[in-house]
Amino acid sequence: MASQALAQTADMSGASRQSASPATTRQTLPTISVHDRRQDPNGLLRMDTANSTGSRLGLTERETPASVTVIDRETIEARGARSTHDVLNELPGVHTSATHGDVKVTQRGFRGASINQVYNGINLQYSIATQPVDAWIYERVEDIGGPSSFLYGAGGVGATINYITKTAQRHDISEVQLGAGTRRYRQAAFGLNRRIAGDGSGQNDHYVRIDTNHERGGQWADDNRGHSSQIVTSLLSDLGGGFTHTLAYEYQHERDYRPYWGTPVTQPAEGRQSVMERLRHKNYNSADGLYMQRVQWLRSMADWKLSDALSVKNTFYGYDAVRDYRNVEEYALDSTNTQVNRTSALLQRHDHRVFGDRIDATLHSTIAGHRSDWSFGVDVSFNRQTTYPTYASDDWESAVDPDHFITEYFYDLPGMVSTYVPKNRHRVNNLAFYLENRTDLTPTLKLLTGLRHERIKLHFSSLDPEEEVKRDGRRSYHPTTGRIGLAWDISPQAMVYAQYATAADPAAGNLASTYYSQILANDRLTTGRMLELGTKLSFWGNRGSATLSVYDISRRNIATNDPRDRRVTYLIGRQDARGVEAKLGLQLTPAWSMQANVGYVDAEYKQFYRRGESLAGKTPSNVPRTVTNLWTSYALTPELKLQAGARHVTRLYGNENDTIWWPSYTVADVGFEYRFSPTVTLSGFVNNVADRLYATESQPDMVVLGDPRTAWLTVKVAF
């Protein structure tokens, strides 16, 4: 359009020179409007941007023989994702449920510790460390479906999700965002990136970035209130000679008063579950219930480009977190639905530290005239966690009226003390070696292979002063996992691929928090393997793009917790999952775009006995068969864009024998974006427009409800 405007200007200028005297006539040219034609985040799939999660070789999604999805910064903002929990629900086939006790992510038929959640590629081996935080501090979220232990270590048979934090860039950034919404939600966020030294030549140039965010309010359960803050800052230094260094620090703080843990279901709790509408917002936690977390990250990243063919990167990292809990966490209605029985009063502290160093290299070479790229490295980490659990008396139970009640102060509970007493300590030391290669067998046929070997040492020790015989358990694990994938570019617009990958998972969940009994019962990690076939293509004159994959995953020797008592463990011999994932992006017209994804999985136990009963053929609890997402945007004018989205989740089983379930649900969202200028944008969103009552997690006697109708506005100013 700009070239057309210049041509039109030239033609009209020539005409004016021919028809008028230069000394006496001046002609005013018509105004030419130039509109921003950036790709809409809800349109075509962005498959040609390099990612760091599907491979360490810097491949794009289109080049990777695996299912890879990237939710970038622009997409996060366009869809109004306020937290990392919101972002996860945009990934294909992903279902999440988040309370402060645990963040349960389900993908490809597996959940919990079978889904690796890593931060800038760093695996903390602890799912509670993945509490949802505001999305402002993240540049993007990347996901690879299926086994990925060969990239990020033990875990990840179902998927790996990688949160990439904002860091300093080589260009100026100045932005402020203010938000307000229902239930007194408030947000204030700020971002700044500047060169503070040097002339931009790459010799002794230094860039600093700081991003801050503060949120308050927005909670929907009665008497639940809280606030959170995040600060991310980094210094990027170009020191010359191909050497750069980035020093990054991150701080997170959150306090949630009287947090919500769930809602009791109507009794009898058999078959289809339901919740009485009048109990939707009830909060049965203690009057002074609390969740608090303080998290700090420090990373030192040195990159050295030795030549066009060889580069080396070293990352030193430190993580320190403290999480405090004082809550009554479980509730059940009695058989007449006239009182709520409250149990599981827990005072807890998690003191978690991780330190490590990772050095890896990338080499571009040839083998017999064929391009061959290599990535190889060493990762060493030291993971320490001390827990401070104190329970109320074993027989403690409180009964209250479902509608009119006053709950106690937590420290008034029988047997409860007001100090944190260390009870358990976990130490996990890990030394890993990894290697990855991509070789061009022909100009259109590429072979991708990967291998990782780990030397893991786990040490559990009891610190409980009341124990007469101290518990002490040690295990060593030496898993080797890998991937082999083949990608065939059948045309410039389409490719097909096949891959086989393996994984090694902790049998009973997270290595940094597993119970002593589980350590004794499991002398090896569980094994998993996957076969996947897929295709990625552009079509319709590059106005459409799509991906499709089918997979078969099998995992052996699993330990799972009893849904009625998390301290009771059952052993599962084998669990399988077969499924299909698809993504579609369309630019229907210059103003109208659409994007959708769907995940279907048939997950079932193959070998599982509980109390002498075979549960073979049953679906694991809280694993939906189908998850579908849809977004569409329409630009009414260059300044105003409307959008809508919908999410459908099929039934969630609440126990292992599939006798209770929460039914399928669909929620719809709407929003708009208005650009007052290229630097000022007003956005508005309404989630769950119909105010649908739905659950994101099902348990035998209670469910975790999803958010009711929620609306908010944000103003973002760039300067």
Predicted segments, located by residue:
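Acidic, small-polar-rich N-terminal luminal/periplasmic segments of exported/outer-membrane proteins
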Residues: 29-172, 533, 700
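Transmembrane beta-barrel wall of Gram-negative outer-membrane proteins
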Residues: 173-175, 180-260, 290-306, 452
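Repeated loop/turn-to-beta-strand initiation elements of outer-membrane beta-barrel proteins
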Residues: 200-201, 205-208, 242-245, 309-312, ...
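Structural signature of Gram-negative outer-membrane beta-barrels, strongest in the C-terminal barrel
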Residues: 238, 352, 371-373, 379-383, ...
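Gram-negative outer-membrane beta-barrel transporters
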Residues: 444, 552-554, 571-656, 690-693, ...
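C-terminal beta-signal and adjacent terminal beta-strands/loops
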Residues: 648-655, 673-719
